[in-house]
Structures are given as C-alpha cells and as structure tokens.
Amino acid sequence: MAPILVIDSMVAGYGAGDILKGVNLSVEAGTVTCLIGPNGSGKSTVLKTVSGLLRPKRGTVAFRDQTINKLSPKARLLLGIVHVPQDRSLFPAMSVWDNLLMGGYMLRDQKLLKQRLDQAVEAFPICRTRAREHAGSLSGGEQKQVELARTLVLDPTLILLDEPSIGLDPKSRQVVFASIRTLCDSGRTVLLVEQNARSGLAASDMGAVLESGIVRLVASGASLLEDPQVARLYLGAASPTPDQPVTP
C-alpha cells in the first residue's frame, strides 16, 4: 500500500527551540499507526504539524503526494485531515445528538449530512441509544466514542488522535481502541499518540518510537510489543533515560 502521509526531515518547535529535530515518517493508507515515546519527545507536536496548528521550520509534510506545509488548518480539514485533541471537545450541556450534528456544520447538502450521520450512528450505536442525553452525563469512554462518531460526520481520510485513552479505565480503553479499529474498516487512516504504549501498539498496524524529537524505530505494532528493549523502556518495566536510547 502506498503512503498517504509522508513527513520528511521535519524540524518544528516554538521560538528558538526545536521540539522535532528531523522527523521522518511514512503512514500507509488504511492503517493505524501509533507514536510512542517519553513525555516531551514531540509526539503531540507531530500531530500539530500535520493538522496545521504548527508550521514546520524545515522539512515537508505531504498528504496524498501534495505538500501541505503552507495550508491552513481549515484547508487541511477540507482535504480530509481531522485532528481530535487530547482534551475532550464535546459540549457537555448539549445532547449527544446535537454534538454529533456539530460535525456537519459545514455541510449544506442535507441528504449528504443524513448519510454521514447514519454511518456514524451505525459505527457508534451509543449515538442512537443515548442520543437525547447530555454529553456531560456520559463516562469518559462513552464521550470518546461520541467524539469519534462526530469525526466520521466530517468524512475524514486521515484522523489524528492525541491520547485517545487518557483518563479511561481498562474496560473503556479497550472499547475505545476497538472503535478506532472500526474507523479503518472503511478505509480511513489513523495516526495516534498514546502514552499507554501497550494498548496503543496492540490496536495498531504500525508503531513508531519517538525520542528527543527524532523517530528512532518504526516497526509493526506486534513486533514492538515483543521487542525486549521497547518493553523495558515503554511497556511498564522502566522509564527511558538519555543513556538508554532505543536502537533499530
């Protein structure tokens, strides 16, 4: 499968400081790719550069063979790149259904809107069973499902997920990652950042280890789970230190 997203030698940061120091990463269409690494390594910054929230200082971001460095976040959204931030983005006082409708605010074609709403509800039945309840009354895992459903209304090609399981209990985390796999069943592509590396890699086709602003290792999610060094540093046995880099 050809890559849908190619990040080449990307340097990015705020002011004089660089968070990303030459990131190279390719993401194949129709797959889930998980970025793991220590806090401050630049994982969320990668998502921001792809979504347009942060312009890279050097290097390129290409989506479907088109360089998108100069495109605004809205222009990238229209191309099919949707960023779901770490913070919950639902309106708690609004109903689940009204939150879902917010995903189609740019659509003027009511027939198309209904079609996308139907697809979202089919993928995430909670949007039907809890439609009239306030979003704020749902659990964290349920709210995340509604966020993902709302993303489908935008008909994305590439979905950027920042810490989708943060604050969730193990059962809710499992449901959310199953939902993420559902997104790819229809040919969509997911690039996610996940601090819970074990859960993220288990749900992903590919994984990438980011350290000190550089991608150190790219492999299948399954092989990274079995890698003793990755397990020691990121799967609960120890914390990485500067003198313990992950090596290919």
Where are each of the predicted segments found?
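Conserved ABC transporter NBD signature motif
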Residues: 59-67, 79, 113-117, 219
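ABC ATPase C-loop
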Residues: 151-152
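Conserved ABC ATPase signature
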Residues: 134-138, 142
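Helix-to-loop junction immediately C-terminal to a conserved catalytic motif
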Residues: 51
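Catalytic Walker B motif of ABC-type/P-loop ATPase nucleotide-binding domains
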Residues: 159-163
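The feature captures the beta-strand-to-loop junction immediately N-terminal to the Walker
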Residues: 36-38
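Conserved catalytic motifs of ABC-family nucleotide-binding domains
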Residues: 155
